[in-house]
């Protein structure tokens, strides 16, 4: 496990995203949960982002702690997310976690998939 104290932060975790995770964990009443962001093949642009709650941190995972909650990224996904930012938005189109990724050369219209 690598955390922010060991290395420069290759990905950012915004206050808005951390606050939403904190609220969701309070609703679930399970403080062991962490937000995991990952990249998989698929979507209309080749790769897509995924978000899930996970109790485990695996060897090699990168973690960021903010507001008492953890964001976890596996090493394979991290290579596609370096320089990016995990954020949260709520508006007329709904609420969601999303990734601002400077490595993406193209994205689909909804922003859920990308190519590099």
UniProtKB/Swiss-Prot annotation:
Top-level taxon of the source organism: Bacteria
HAMAP family: Fe_S_insert_ErpA (MF_01380)
Cofactor: iron-sulfur cluster
Pfam hit, one: Fe-S_biosyn
Record keyword Methyltransferase present: no
Role this protein plays: Required for insertion of 4Fe-4S clusters for at least IspG.
Gene3D superfamilies with a match to the protein in the record: HesB-like domain
GO cellular component term, pick one: cytosol
Residue numbers binding iron-sulfur cluster: 44, 108, 110
Coiled-coil annotated spans: none
One GO term (biological process): iron-sulfur cluster assembly
Upper taxonomic lineage: Bacteria, Pseudomonadati, Pseudomonadota, Gammaproteobacteria, Alteromonadales
SUPFAM superfamilies in alphabetical order: HesB-like domain
Organism field: Shewanella baltica (strain OS155 / ATCC BAA-1091)
Molecular function in Gene Ontology: 2 iron, 2 sulfur cluster binding; 4 iron, 4 sulfur cluster binding; iron ion binding
Cofactor: how and how many bound: Binds 1 iron-sulfur cluster per subunit.
Name recorded for this polypeptide: Iron-sulfur cluster insertion protein ErpA
Family: Belongs to the HesB/IscA family.
Known partners and oligomeric status: Homodimer.
Sorted UniProt keywords: Iron, Iron-sulfur, Metal-binding
